[in-house]
Amino acid sequence: MRAACRCETPRACMIFARSAHTISERMKREEMDAVRRALPVPQRVMAVVLSALFVLCPLAAYAAGEEADAVPLPIIMYHEVKPDKSGKDAIQPWELESDLRWLAENGYTTVVMADVIAYVRDGTPLPEKPIVLSFDDGYYNNYVYVLPLLRQYAARIVFSLLGRNTDDFTEWPSESIDYAHVTWAQLNEMLASGLVEVQNHSYDLHAYTSERHGCMQNRGESDAAYTELLRADLQRLQDELAEYTGRTPDTFAYPYGKYGDLTDTVLRGMGFQATLSCDWGINRLTRDSACLYRLRRICRSHGQPLSAALERAYRAAG
């Protein structure tokens, strides 16, 4: 038979019960500690390891499960598309058409960075075989040769712009296939198609000289000076894009693929939700927003079929 409670009030009874439970739990811990101390050293170490595994294994299983559910995302990096000259950073129009036809025949769907970010941050579904086609620098030949092919194949691209070049060629227009860049009017025509997403490639940091390598911090340059320079450059293009197109980029493509730890800190502080690098490989998208930074890309060069480049990248990714 249970003994009658001798507490003067129900509240006192509750406090007494909680205290008894706390004392009981403490005694259990002390007993377990005593058992562990009584064990020989090797067994004592093993007991600690096993205790840790009870905590870590569920976390590892969760991480492994998330990785298993990761979505493979190839991002192809293009630059110029023109009929006469070709090389590492320039392919011919028939090569791009071959890429678009092959992708359509093999079940790929082109997506843009808004789709990628929405999947990672909000869980918005992606198509079964997503792929990003990114075009850097804002060349006029992209307007001439790429846009018609996008319309023909209903494909979408990410178009990363250099602000100063667009300003210059808006003021002094040129139809040179070899060196001209798009004007603001041409960019707006591309955006109006619904097939082009514009992103930030810097206003005027696309240079690789003794003075600076892309948007990298120089040796000996103070963090404050570098932060001010980078923010001012990128914000200028953000402001111009908002003014001339009504768009605000959320992705930054590193000029020449150069970056540092402070670069990413500044970019995140400015609200950029993703970055495109020149590191080679296939990306694996999870629901962790960290996977959106320094996204890998596969450079599409003349004479190297996209199908072969993708096969090699998938094989390397395992």
Spans of model-derived segments:
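Bacterial N-terminal signal peptides that target proteins for export
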Residues: 35-49
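Hydrophobic core
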Residues: 50, 54-58
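Metal-dependent polysaccharide deacetylase catalytic core of the NodB/CE4 family, i.e.
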Residues: 71, 76-86, 129-131, 151-260, ...
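Alpha-helical scaffolding within the catalytic cores
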Residues: 114-119, 142-146, 174-194, 280-284
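Substrate-binding cleft of extracellular glycoside hydrolase catalytic domains
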Residues: 115-116, 128, 132-141, 153-155
